[in-house]
Amino acid sequence: MPQATRWPDIVFASDWRLATLSEATKAGRLRRIARGIYTPSEDPVEAVVRRNWMQLLGRAFPGAVIVDRSTRAGSPDSSGCLYVDHARRRALALPGLVIVPRSGPGPLSGDQALHGFYVSSTARGLLDNLAGGGGRCLSREEIEAWITEIATRHGEPRLNALRDQAREIAAAAGREDAFTRLSTIISAALSTGTVDAVVSHALQASAAGNPYDHERLALFTTAAAYLADQAPASLPDLPDLASRRRLFPFYEAYFSNSIEGTEFTLDEAASIIFDAAIPAERPEDAHDVLGTYRVVADPVEMARAPGSADDLIELLKRRHAIIMEGRPDKSPGRFKTRANRAGATVFVAPRLVEGTLRAGFDVGRSLLDPFARAVFVMFLVAEVHPFADGNGRVARVMMNAELAAAHEGRIVIPTVYRGEYLSATKAATHNAVFAPIAAVLAFAQRYAAQVNFETRATAERDLARTNALVDPQTAEDNNIHLLLPASLDRVGMA
């Protein structure tokens, strides 16, 4: 008995005997897609064509170069359209795929060879699109967005290399005029061009000397929109709570450092803050706690919320200088000069820090609710990560200053609540989901309002009975959660 033929996902008639194809088609083992093209798959024809577009392109347009607007993705767009440079004049229309050719110089230096075809280099793609050509080319706004993305992700060296490569191929591509336009746009992206040479807000900001991370700004815009849609969450810091809050700054500083891994016992932290007893074996960690306390214990300082982007920059630098005074190697009060990251999260590039803070502040200034502003500024600072170290601490200081300035209750994140806080922050960073961080901070604010901070004894009684000091991993392993003091009081009265 003859062995059954094992057909590839896409079958070209030129590779097989006509009789074999005819028999398989009649028997229902193959379906005809178009002239000379078959498939054994029972999937929708459009799906078969889309997943085999590379083979189809290489066969129908051998040596073609993907060009024009198709260069950006290097593949067909959502409608299935793919633009190529090839000598063939007629388009190929298949279910789910339309390949549209135009004449051109063919492959150039820098183009990437794939399965019988080429993909234009980024430099060539930009030149082709800037040359124009109706619907087959990107708009000026789309081109500038592409360049902005390159600048954000790869920085100045990549832009300069891109311009050099474009200069080398411009004549061969017949794109000398397009190169002039590209060079002007890149100059704006490098803050060496003029504002009126570009149309996008991101590149205009770059040209004006305030380049920003446009992807982060989109994230901040989403955050502000979410927070603006929430009902106001007022929790006033009433005057009759003043005595209960005498020691609040101590615990605020303690827990803010604990989140960052600076671990002391409460007695050790009290000696550092109230007795200036700096442990010889951990002077830098001790100064972190002391510096944070100096900021949050100053009622005048904590009553200041930024009213402008200039205020934001000034407050950030001054507060950071105080918090990180004990770590001169971390450049207290000065923005970072090297890129930083945490795990898979890469923060805003140094050259984009100030511009991103300014643009982000402008996005958030429309928020009216103090709690919403507090959440927003905390996320803004944490996401930009403007300093070499101390970013989380200064972000939470900025958060609580927004609340203090509006006479609202401030927030502490107890040790046991660290996991929830960090998970919620990651959800905002990676998924643009802001409900968790708003909920976590709202609960932490309610918690802080219910703890009796009048004396260390009263405060630490509440901290102990609410699980505040439990190690986060121990809490997770044993299903231990942060409890509200009021909920325990109600149980005790029952």
In which residue ranges do the predicted regions lie?
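FIC/Doc superfamily catalytic core
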Residues: 1-33, 41-53, 58-59, 63-389, ...
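Short helix-loop capping/hinge segments that flank enzyme active sites or metal/cofactor-binding pockets
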Residues: 38
